[in-house]
Every structure is written in structure tokens, then in C-alpha cells.
């Protein structure tokens, strides 16, 4: 629901009805994999346009249920792309420590705020919220933009070290891709 609603909102930024239709066609898709092998196959196929990966900890790998499959999946994806957002979901809080150690975001499936926490991570790390330019040293907010027009109006006001920080980590490309603005994002 949330991703589809955001895609509809982004389409309204288009200049004309044709551009809005193109944006809706290019909107982000949620892909579901039931095994490690399916997940890696989907990642390999779509990695150039992947906004992020959300994984459970336990699921089948090599034909058997594997209690480490989620960590193995995210570790293997991280080897290919050090900046793609990776979110681990688990009902076992002990997995949070390992997720933190591996630099994966973590969501506790037992949390009463699960949907809010997941939505926040998707907004902040997968390009669906405002784009927040940060100081690369302090991580303090420098500027915030909600639309492509605001980005255009503010881009030359952003300090070069902040711009380089975000560009080198594909943050801006991810934000543009979430809005189906592919030619600019590349």
C-alpha cells in the first residue's frame, strides 16, 4: 500500500499526463522470493534497479530450511553492492546484534510499531521520503527536498563534500529511481 501510494504521489510531479503515465509504468515493484536461490536470481536480474532488500532470517536454502539464510543472502548482496539498503526482519531480538554488526538495518517483527518502523526505513533508505542532504562528517541535515523541482532549485547550494558523499553512495540515484526518473538517475 505505502509504496504504491508514494508512486502515485510521485507521478503527480510529472509535467504532463504522458509523463505521469510513464512514471506509473516505471514505478518500483515489490518482488517476493521464497528461497535463497529465488532471492539471488531476482537480485541478479534487477540489481541495477534495486532500491533495497528486505529479508527474513529463516527460509529455505539448497532445499532445506536454513536458520542463517537471511544473513547469507544479505551478506552475498552486500559483496556486490556495498551501499544498497538491506533490512533484516526477525522476531528474535538476538538477531539485532548480528544485523547491527553486519551493518544491516533491523526490524523486530514483534514490535507494536513494526509497520511504522519499516515504513521509516523504506522512506529514509530506499528513496521514498524526502531527500536529506547530510554533512558527511557529522551526518547533520544540511538541506531537505521533497520534489524534483526542489532538488533543481537547491542543487547548487549543497556543499560539494555532501554532494560527493551522496552521489558516491548512489543515494541520489536511488531517490530518483524511486520516482521513476531513470534517465537522470543514471
Label each residue range with its predicted role.
Residues 7-52, 62:
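Acidic, metal-coordinating helix/loop segments flanking the phosphotransfer/catalytic sites
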Amino acid at each position: 500500500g505505502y509504496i504504491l501510494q508514494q508512486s502515485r504521489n510521485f507521478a503527480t510531479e510529472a509535467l504532463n499526463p504522458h509523463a505521469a503515465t510513464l512514471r506509473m509504468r516505471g514505478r518500483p515493484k515489490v518482488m517476493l522470493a521464497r528461497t535463497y536461490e529465488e532471492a539471488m536470481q531476482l537480485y541478479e536480474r534487477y540489481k541495477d534497479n534495486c532500491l533495497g532488500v528486505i529479508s527474513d532470517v529463516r527460509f529455505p536454502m539448497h532445499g532445506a530450511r536454513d536458520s542463517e539464510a537471511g544473513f547469507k543472502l544479505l551478506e552475498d548482496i552486500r559483496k556486490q553492492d556495498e551501499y544498497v539498503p538491506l533490512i533484516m526482519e526477525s522476531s528474535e531480538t538476538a538477531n539485532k546484534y548480528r544485523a547491527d554488526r553486519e551493518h544491516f538495518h533491523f526490524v523486530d517483527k514483534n514490535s507494536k510499531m513494526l509497520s511504522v518502523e519499516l515504513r521509516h526505513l523504506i522512506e529514509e533508505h530506499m528513496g521514498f521520503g524526502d531527500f536529506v542532504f547530510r554533512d558527511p562528517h557529522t551526518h547533520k541535515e544540511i538541506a531537505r527536498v521533497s520534489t524534483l523541482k526542489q532538488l533543481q532549485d537547491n542543487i547548487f547550494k549543497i556543499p560539494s563534500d555532501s554532494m560527493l558523499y551522496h552521489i558516491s553512495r548512489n543515494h541520489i540515484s536511488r531517490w530518483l529511481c524511486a520516482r521513476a526518473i531513470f534517465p537522470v538517475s543514471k
